Amino acid sequence: MSMQDTVADMLTRVRNAQMAKKQTVSMPSSKLKVAIANVLQQEGYISNVEVAQEETKSTLTITLKYFEGKPVIEMVKRVSRPGLRQYRGKDKLPSVKQGLGIAIVSTSKGIMTDRAARAAGIGGEVIAFVS
């Protein structure tokens, strides 16, 4: 049985690992997952992203980040899902927690935050909310 929503699986693994106070979390890798992890790293939600290539598969390892014993990521929510895609224009991109969180957006220029997409003047598919 194949997995239907690999991005939701990635976000759930990160959420569960942080609740269990794990230092790292590993999962099967894909270009989309690596791009999302890189955005999370640039925004300071995770410490490190590594992709290890084995014989036939690659593994994505994310090093989680904590502040005073609490996870840096308070909330992570999948928005656009395979059964209901959520596309927004540049003027309708959502703001998460009045700008304290980020929305991860898939645009024609790649995966980026809602702020970067607004600055570039492009919309796209809203993948997830993170705060």
UniProtKB/Swiss-Prot annotation:
Signal sequence span is none
- Give an example GO molecular function: rRNA binding
List the Pfam families.
Answer: Ribosomal_S8
Organism equals Acinetobacter baumannii (strain AB0057)
One Gene Ontology CC term in the entry: ribosome
Superkingdom is Bacteria
Listed name of the protein: Small ribosomal subunit protein uS8
User: How does it associate, per the subunit comment?
Assistant: Part of the 30S ribosomal subunit. Contacts proteins S5 and S12.
Similarity comment: family membership: Belongs to the universal ribosomal protein uS8 family.
What biological-process terms (Gene Ontology) are attached? translation
Q: List the SUPFAM superfamilies.
A: Ribosomal protein S8
What function does the entry list?
Answer: One of the primary rRNA binding proteins, it binds directly to 16S rRNA central domain where it helps coordinate assembly of the platform of the 30S subunit.
Q: Which UniProt keywords apply?
A: Ribonucleoprotein, Ribosomal protein, RNA-binding, rRNA-binding
